[in-house]
Amino acid sequence: MLRSAAWLMLILALFLGFILLVARPVVAVACPWCFGLEKTAEGVYVEAAMPAAARQHALQLLTQAEERVGNFYGGLQHAPRTLICATPRCFERIGGGGTRVGSVGSFELLVAPEGINVVLMSHELSHVELHGRVGLWHMELGAVPAWFDEGVAVLVSDDPQYLAPARHGRDRCAAGPQADMPVDPADWRAQLEERGDLLYASAACQVDLWMIANGGPPAVPALLAKLRDGQTFDSLYKP
């Protein structure tokens, strides 16, 4: 009996360890205080050691990022719980990985110290909004190609690293579109290592040219609504 109980406790401990290792961001968003974060605004948790001035600055930049995304999409339909770290150790603890800003579906935004800026946060918030509008199940089934998702995020964030300056009547292409753009997120990451930043610029260019031909930014939420209803990207996207 005691031996069975010991085995059960061991299995339970291993299971909990696996959950904390693999699903740490999900655990962190469910219990931010368990990871040393505290609430600083509605839906926003920061590392407890973050000074008051730094908290206020982070909140201001987050608000600007939300406004940037809302302006593009015609309003925000999804408000993720946001976890902001002041130290790399905190970001590692909540499962942030190697990114500066990360997200889980449409319900969580993870921000590293170097990710506290408008461009990076609005880029990731675009992913949150896009995934939420299409639906997580549809996203898991590959409803939106990775290049489109990333290209939209670059345009939403107005990232000068990958975009040409805004000019009236002109596109934002800093690099031309490329053939065989990656569709699967894993392929995107693999090609990113090969092509580098050019991949982001090309994806943004391809999306921008499509938007110009289809009425501007409102074409994106209109497309996403149809994808959520079950239509396919290939049937809707006309270069």
Language-model segment annotations:
Residues G105-S122, L136-P145:
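Short pre-active-site segment immediately N-terminal to the catalytic Zn-binding motif
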Residues M1-R3:
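N-terminal Lys/Arg-rich, disordered targeting/topogenic segments
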Residues V69, V119-G135, E150-V154:
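Active-site recognition of the HExxH zinc-binding catalytic motif
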Residues L120, H138-C205, L209-P239:
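Acidic/His/Gly-enriched intrinsically disordered linker/tail segments
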Residues L37-R55, F107:
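Acidic/histidine-rich, surface-exposed loop or edge segments in extracytoplasmic proteins
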